[in-house]
């Protein structure tokens, strides 16, 4: 039996315009963890968002208005590939993923956390970003060494 696909929820105008733009997020930028202590899911369980942005403090301000909450910055880490870093973080913490209000910008990137998991997220973010940045440095060093060998032998 044929079922019609469920239409995606319409976002507010600003969020919809942002999603319609073609973006390349496999570039240098920042990955952040924002904590919303007001989004209570149980005893000691709140919500954190793992996301990417080139301007994370502006993003915090925008999301605080969008979700009508005062988000707190738990970590902001510079990385050479912000999309890859964010994807790895989402895979690491996939078991605690929980969507927020459907239709709002970034509503699928939220995770249920307690104080221990917040610390785990912060440490993991620094480790993943360090690994990716190191891989980029090694790649650049190998390219420079190869070029110098070819040009100056």
Report each predicted region and the residues it spans.
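Non-catalytic accessory segments flanking enzymatic or RNA/DNA-binding domains
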Residues: 1-153
